Regions:
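Conserved GNAT-fold acetyl-CoA-binding loop/helix
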Residues: 28-48
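Acyl-donor (CoA/ACP) binding surface of acyl/acetyltransferases
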Residues: 1-32, 56-161
Length: 161
């Protein structure tokens, strides 16, 4: 998957080029906020495993090719542990100096539009106090479905087709 927008290139990270994500490792709190880790640290081995088993997308600026962040599409599972076809949960993170400039809205919207063309459902879980992520999800046509115990909200992207 490779998507180009006005300002960005969003493309899949493969295990062999996961080292390009090294600049993100110093922002461990972003991985926690994105729900990708609850304890411990994310390292290149962890990212390599994610790149092999899930869909890890890097976000880069078109002109400079500078790494801005990640979008990760995680398989969704039913109650028996079986993978739900055509359904992903999204997690994302952006370098702090690049936040609040519309980059994540632009990237996530483009990715979701591409997935929508294949009738793929995208959901997200976000803490109720994470106003920035809630704003991104709202701007990308997600709607709040439910609030779970622990202030975790479940959002689902509306079908745009």
């Amino acid at each position: 998957m490779k998507i180009k927008t006005k300002r960005l290139i969003v493309e899949r990270v493969h295990r062999q080029n996961v080292i390009e994500l090294t600049p993100l490792l110093k922002y461990q709190s972003l991985f926690q906020q994105a729900g990708l880790v609850t304890v411990g640290k994310v390292d290149l081995v962890t990212l390599g495993i994610l790149a092999q088993t899930e869909c890890v997308l890097q976000i880069r600026e078109r002109g400079e090719q500078g790494l801005l962040g990640l979008i990760i599409l995680l398989h969704s599972y039913d109650k028996t542990g079986a993978i739900l076809p055509k359904q992903y949960e999204v997690g994302y993170l952006l370098l702090p100096r690049k936040q609040h400039q519309g980059y994540m809205t632009e990237a996530l919207s483009a990715v979701c539009d591409q997935l929508n063309r294949s009738q793929i459902t995208v959901t997200a879980e976000v803490r109720s106090d994470n106003a920035s992520s809630i704003g991104v999800l709202s701007r990308c046509n997600f709607i709040r479905i439910t609030i779970n115990p622990g202030m975790i909200e479940l959002w689902k992207r509306q079908d745009m087709g």
